[in-house]
A protein has these predicted regions:
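Surface-exposed, glycine-biased beta-strand/turn segments
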Residues: 24-113, 133, 155-156, 196-200, ...
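Beta-sheet ligand-binding and adhesion/scaffold domains
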Residues: 291-376
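Sec-dependent signal peptide recognition
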Residues: 1-4
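Bacterial signal peptide processing site
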Residues: 12-16
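C-terminal motif of bacterial Sec signal peptides marking the signal peptidase cleavage site
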Residues: 8-10
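Zn2+-dependent peptidoglycan hydrolase active-site motif and core
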Residues: 94-146, 167
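Conserved, short, structured surface segments that act as functional micro-motifs
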Residues: 109-119, 143-227
Length: 376
């Protein structure tokens, strides 16, 4: 597995917010995704970390392993990620605020912290996989696997910790509700998720240009996108019927009921079919022919067959090494078919699905009694 894919897979369950949820004041559900310029914290005049030391930024929206639906945080990756990891990178508070919580993630042998900084009543910065805390924060550090609420004032640009390898960052803006989640009630387990826009738009132009130049994604929004739902269409994320939405039925494997027909986070014209339960595993595939576009599949379309295939990223004519910076990548599917998945939108928000392992679209013509229903 490539380094960047190992990186995604290593980020444990809970998504960008991770751990315990953090409220963010009043929620405005007007679907306006433009930052509120009247907010005196904006634009941010400091980056989230020392950008001069990173190799690249993995944008929002990746899908890998048990991250079945698009990931709600970015990854800021050092050049030596996965090697000796001797490069230490400072993490900053991009604007003045208060550290409202610190969590020890407890997933690894070394210290691994999640930090939430409230910049206003509605805007937060969230970091995961911070290796060490700044002196101001370290007296409040929880023990392994624990979580503490705090109220620690930090200045704009103040160092709050450091990391080696990679850190997760996302921004939450509770004044914004992303329009590509057609049923926000399915995300109550991670309430920040529907309020997680592209962070790049929140920084001053000088910093924003540096962020844009470091992202592996060349298409707008360059910082990534996690909301792909269209009402009455296949595209976007789904949850197995009666499985409690994003939360699932078991917090230890909440992703089992997840399903997504979305777009790749780096090359967004490439369709990704992402499964929380693919013969007991969590798997992602391209679809043979990269068609039909799930945005074009509606109730009137009827039965659709997707042949599931592996895929590769290309930097020019060469497969991307998954560890060095580049932009303008393309993707290509392999020809070997792992399975065929049948899908049919039986109602605008109800989807019928069945996977036929080891078979192709030529082998299968109809659902069996093993078909499963998913809802938004």
């Amino acid at each position: 597995m490539g380094l960047s894919l190992m990186l995604l897979a290593s980020c444990g369950g809970g998504g960008g917010g991770g751990g315990d949820s953090d409220g963010g004041g009043d929620v405005n559900s007007d679907n306006d995704t433009t930052p509120d310029v009247a907010d005196q914290t904006l634009p941010f005049d400091y980056p989230p970390l020392d950008l001069s030391k990173i190799e690249f930024i993995l944008p929002l929206g990746g899908m890998i392993g048990n991250h079945v639906t698009p990931i709600d945080h970015q990854y800021y990756v050092a050049p030596d990620f996965g090697a000796n990891e001797t490069i230490v990178i400072d993490v900053y508070s991009p604007a003045a605020g208060r550290v409202s919580s610190i969590q020890h993630m407890g997933n690894f042998d070394n210290d691994d912290y999640r930090i939430v900084v409230d910049h206003s009543t509605t805007i937060q910065s969230i970091y995961i996989h911070v290796d060490s805390l700044a002196d101001k924060l370290s007296p409040f550090a929880p023990t392994n696997g624990q979580y503490v609420n705090t109220d620690i004032e930090v200045a704009a640009g103040e160092i709050i910790g450091s990391y080696s390898g990679s850190v997760d960052y996302n921004l939450v803006d509770y004044d914004i509700t992303l329009p590509g989640f057609v049923n926000p009630d399915s995300y109550t387990a991670e309430p920040w998720k529907i309020h997680t826009p592209d962070p790049f738009d929140y920084f001053n132009d000088t910093i924003r240009q540096t962020l844009l130049a470091k992202s592996l994604r060349a298409a707008e929004p360059i910082g990534g996108k996690i909301d792909h739902d269209m009402d009455g269409r296949l595209v976007g994320s789904w949850f197995r019927e009666n499985s409690n939405g994003y939360a699932g039925l078991d917090p230890n494997n909440y992703w089992l009921g997840h399903l997504s027909f979305s777009y790749d986070y780096i090359v967004p014209d490439h369709i990704i079919a992402s499964f929380g339960d693919y013969a007991g595993e969590q798997r992602q595939f391209g679809v043979l022919g990269n068609a039909p576009d799930p945005a074009d599949v509606g109730v009137s379309t009827g039965l659709v067959k997707y042949d599931l295939v592996s895929y590769e990223y290309y930097d020019g004519a060469t497969p991307w090494d998954r560890s060095s910076f580049t932009q303008g990548m393309t993707m290509d599917n392999y020809s070997f078919i792992d399975a065929v998945v049948l899908v049919q939108l039986v109602e605008e928000r109800r989807l019928k699905v069945e996977i036929f392992h080891g078979q192709t679209s030529a082998d299968v013509s109809a659902f069996t009694d093993d078909a499963i229903h998913y809802v938004r």
